[in-house]
Amino acid sequence: MLFRSKLERKSYEITKQYYFIEDWKASIAESKNFISSYPNSPKAEEVFYINLRSNYLLSKNSVEKKKEERLDKTIESYLKFIDLYPQSKYLGEADDIYTTCKKLKEELNSQKNGL
């Protein structure tokens, strides 16, 4: 059990480290690994939020060609997050991310349609 706890803590710290150095792709990958390996961890909610925020920041800073797909992934991540953690302390920030992503998608669609 102690060994698993150390591995869990290490994975958590790596996820946070990638997030803080703004390596969004690595943060997303490591947070997914953490969530699949330790779904019942007390840190799972925070790591899922880091995953959501990393998806958002990656999509926001993407080239136009990849932006829509990444916005869709962020919205999907948000929907999973609120399904799993409807009373989360991160709910306000998560809702803001969702609202911003919807607006960005609308802007992209209106640009595509020449409006």
Model-derived segments and spans:
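Acidic, polar-rich low-complexity tracts and alpha-helical solenoid repeat scaffolds
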Residues: 1-115
